[in-house]
Each structure stands twice: as C-alpha cells, then as structure tokens.
Amino acid sequence: MGVKTILYQEDARKALERGMDILAEAVSVTLGPKGRNVVLEKKFGTPQIVNDGVTIAKEINLQDTLENTGVSLIRQAASKTNDVAGDGTTTATVLAYAIIKQGMRNVAAGANPIVLKRGIEKATQFVVRKIMDYARPIENLTDITQVAQISAGNDAEVGSLIANAIDKVGREGLISLEESKSTATELEITEGMGFDRGFISGYFVTNTERMEVVLDNPYILLTDKKITVVKQDLVPTLELVSKTNQPLLIISDNVEKEALATLIVNKLRGILNVVAVRAPGFGDRRKAILQDLAVLTGGDVITADAGLSLERMDIENLGVARRVVVGKENTTIISDSNKQEVLARCEQLRRQMETSDSTYEKEKLQERLAKLTGGVAVIKVGAATETEMKDRKLRLEDAVNATKAAVEEGIVPGGGTTLIHIAAELLEWVKETLTGDELLGGLIVEKALQAPLKKIALNAGENGSIIVERIKESDFEIGYNAATNEIVDMYEAGIIDPAKVTRSTLQNAASIASMILTTECIIVDKNKETK
C-alpha cells in the first residue's frame, strides 16, 4: 500500500476547493447562447471542440491528487444529471459550485456543517416542489421544437429535425444517432425495436467513452434457453458466424459463467465481435417478445417448443439487422427488412387485443404493438469535418434527451429564469420556516439559484447582478434572452427548459455540495507533490 497524505478540516476543504475552481471555470464558459467552446486535446486523432459540460468535466484530470479529488466530486453533479435527464450538466456544475463556495465560507465562520446540510436539503425540496407546480405540459410540436433548439445551442435545424422524429415515432419512440456519409443532417424512419436490457459484461463494450456496444450488420441469435454448455450451446453458432466476418448479438435467458468467458475471450482476441444480452420480460411474455424480435429480424427463436436446438441450427435461423446499439440498460435494434412480416405481426397483436378480456393483458399487448409499429427514428448527423461532426453529435444527443425529459415532466421558462423567480418565494419561506444554521443553509440555496443566470449574462458580456434584479421584479414568465440581450416573455420567445432537467440539476448539485461541506478529512495517495 502506498504512502498517504491526510488533511483535516479547513485544509481538507481548501484543497478540494482549488480543484473545483478549475473545473467550474472550464465548464461554465459554455453556459448560455453566447457561451464559448472548449478545445480538448485527444491522445489520438484531431483535437475535439465541444460545448457540452459533462464531456469537458470528464476530460479534466489534475496533477495534484488533492485538487483532483475536488474535480472528481463536483464532476459527479454533472454526471448524475446527465444520467437522469441527459442535459443540464453545465447548470448542475455552476449550481454545485455556488452552493459549495458559500457553504465553505459559512463553515469557516463557525456554522455547523450538518445543520447547514439540513437547511440546504429542505430548501432544495421546496424549490423542486415549486418547479413541479409551475411546469407546463408539452402541448404541441412547437414546444418540442423549441426545447430541442435551445438544448442544441440555438440550432433551429436540429429543433425541427427532432420534433419531426418524435412526431413520426411517437413520444415513447426510439431516436438513434448515426454519422452521415454526407455533410447534410437528415432524418430516416426505419423498422426497429428497443427493450430495457443491456450488455451482460462490460468487456463487450466497443465505445468506452459512451459505454455502449455498436454492431453494424450483425447476425442475431434469439433463444429462450440458458446458454451453459460451451461445446453444445455456443460453438456451433460461433463457428457459423465467424466464417462470415460479421458481428453477433446473442439474446438469451442468460449466459452462464463458462460460456460468458468463452464469448469474452473470442471478443478480446478479435476472433468475433460479439455481445450477449438477457431477453426482456418473463415466462410466456418473454417468449412473445422474442417472437416479435424474430419477425423484425427475419430469424427464428431457438426453442424446444419449435423443435429447434442450439446444437443443430443453421445460419438461416439467425436474424439480421442493419445496426444494433447496446447500452448498460437498453438495447436498440435497427432493421430495414421484413416490412410485410412486421405489419402482419402487428395485425395479429391487434386481433389479440380485441379478443382479450384482461386489462393487464391488453396493456402488455399495446406496449408490444407500440414498440413494433413505432419503429426507430435514425438521425444521420452530417458535417464538413470530423471535429464538427463530434460537436454536432453531442449537441443532438443533448437535444434528444432534453426533449424526452420535457415530454415526461413538462416545461418551465429557460435561461435560469425559473430559478430566479422561485428564489424570491424560497427567501420568504426560509425566513418563516427555518432558524439558526438551517436558515443559513436555505439562504445559501437562495443565493446559488441566481448563479446560472448571472453566468449566462456574464458570458453574453453583461452585468449578471443587474439582470437578476430586473428579472426578480417581473412576472414568472419574464426572463433574459441572452441571444438578443432583451427582457422577454420566455414562453413566447421559445426559451424553455424541461422541468425534469431544471429539477435534476438542483437536486444533484445540492446532494454533491452537501457531501463536500460535511467533509472533515481527506486521504489521498502521496504519489505526487501536494501543496
């Protein structure tokens, strides 16, 4: 075990703060319509130009281990928000930083960190309740276009593309991003289906940055069996597919240890690009979903019921797809063949729904039907250079996530406006309800809620404090349009944020900030010179 450096109390918090200053400064320059870009040097290939908070946060690694711990902690606020809402990562970082900065000042002045934390949590819960109260449900395609446009950095083309995609595949539909061969970004609707199961092992991952497996033109093995005996269950399929030089997706009940090890070895040695996924659902429903997948991919479900076995099967029994994307928790299959078979299967499901008496059964059939008929909207991202392509893809991804979040929980005025208006209500509530250091915690949150708008204004070259005061005196819908430097009705101007993103940014920022404020000791490796 290496030698450790141990810091206590104020020294510990100060060391963390130094790292946070660096990360917050680098990330916050991208906030708002006039936010700047950040260039990331890559070990291989061209540098990447990005405007995405979480991507920048993931790249920052400092030499000083103590400072780096601070970076890692505040990075969690961005990562957590990205996992929950898929957008709002820069705002989460700015909020977390604002709460921590003020909190540390209060702790240094003698406030009790535990009581302070309680105050921060109570104030956060109040704000979250208010956000949900003010949220307006998505009513039309224009709302969707505006949410997507704002999230993609004010790109009108992206806004209408995503709105069209959701219009075509429905609110529950799948949207996939691909790199285009041309410079144009276009939308294509294909046959496809997704389900909530991810890869069995991280060794299958092909894209470590996004932690996902992408297979082009794969064969697909569908079975309701457990794959246990390597020689009988696996080898015949692996031999068939390895001759074709195409990847393989296995969807089965489970893959036992020895069989999984065989697949991983084949993958790591480059013999076969393969990924294994557990089949969705249980019992008869699982068999039915596998049958849906078989119709979509033109394959057979290898099951004893149909007299098929893994030992004696042919390449014709395997399904095929144009593309498969497997994440930690989801799998998307994009196929563009078998249109007639899919339509026939949908008709069959509709007839089953008509004859079924059980409400539960009808719901499940409706779910399957929606997945089959919805298809997948594939947005082919085009750009003149690879650097622009990567930046555009990140913006599109944010926009897709933000739009889905907006559909889920509704929309609120964007540009930090909602937080400013709720801050005024929070101030009254905190003064009436909280006392002592809890009151201080509430006031910290009230002040931190102003930070995103101040930063947006600062990035636009304006005085943030003056803008905040002007917004405070206005109605709830009124906010600051940094693109035109005007005070406007945010709904009319189309500057809106998903309530889910606004809520998640504050919840994650407050959670990380509370943990850091209650830190009394840091233990890190003494492998580098620490200050």
Curated annotation (Swiss-Prot):
Binding site residues for ATP: 30-33, 87-91, 415, 481-483, 497
Record GO biological process: protein refolding
EC id: 5.6.1.7
Class of this enzyme: isomerase
Main location: plastid
Keywords, sorted A to Z: ATP-binding, Chaperone, Chloroplast, Isomerase, Nucleotide-binding, Plastid
Subcellular location: Plastid, Chloroplast
Reaction(s) this enzyme catalyzes, per UniProt: ATP + H2O + a folded polypeptide = ADP + phosphate + an unfolded polypeptide
Complex and partners: Forms a cylinder of 14 subunits composed of two heptameric rings stacked back-to-back. Interacts with the co-chaperonin GroES.
HAMAP family: CH60
Job of this protein: Together with its co-chaperonin GroES, plays an essential role in assisting protein folding. The GroEL-GroES system forms a nano-cage that allows encapsulation of the non-native substrate proteins and provides a physical environment optimized to promote and accelerate protein folding.
Family that this chain belongs to: Belongs to the chaperonin (HSP60) family.
Name used for this protein in its record: Chaperonin GroEL, chloroplastic
Annotated organism of origin: Emiliania huxleyi (Coccolithophore)
